[in-house]
């Protein structure tokens, strides 16, 4: 059981790294006015499906690590 959890954790981590690398970088504008961003797409509107998959994989990795910690305690 522990080998399976370890392999699953490694696979989820590699998938998570690949997804993060494949996403384009977002521009950060700390100094701009709020009026200048009106009409521009929000964070979730660009690459929506990649970001949803990234969110799901990170939650699965977190839950797998929690379960692995419970099993080994």
Swiss-Prot record:
One GO-annotated biological process of the protein: protein transport
Keyword Transmembrane helix: yes
Subunit structure: Part of the accessory SecA2/SecY2 protein translocation apparatus required to export cell wall protein GspB.
Covalent S-S links between cysteines: none
Listed name of the protein: Accessory secretory protein Asp5
UniProt signal peptide: 1-30
Localization in the cell: Cell membrane
Record key words, sorted: Cell membrane, Membrane, Protein transport, Signal, Translocation, Transmembrane, Transmembrane helix, Transport
Purpose: Part of the accessory SecA2/SecY2 system specifically required to export GspB, a serine-rich repeat cell wall protein encoded upstream in the same operon.
Main location: membrane
Disruption phenotype annotation: No export of mature cell wall protein GspB, a small amount of unprocessed protein is exported to the cell wall while the rest accumulates intracellularly, probably in a glycosylated form. Cells bind less well to platelets.
Record field: transmembrane: 52-72
UniProt cross-references to InterPro entries, sorted A to Z: Asp5
A Gene Ontology term for the protein's cellular component: plasma membrane
Membrane topology value: Single-pass membrane protein
């Amino acid at each position: 059981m522990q080998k399976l959890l370890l392999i699953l954790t490694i696979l989820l981590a590699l998938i998570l790294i690949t997804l993060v690398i494949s996403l384009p970088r977002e521009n950060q504008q700390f100094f701009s006015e709020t009026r200048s961003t009106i009409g521009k797409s929000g964070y979730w509107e660009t690459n929506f499906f990649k970001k949803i998959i990234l969110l799901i994989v990170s939650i699965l990795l977190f839950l797998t690590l929690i379960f692995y910690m419970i099993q080994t305690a």
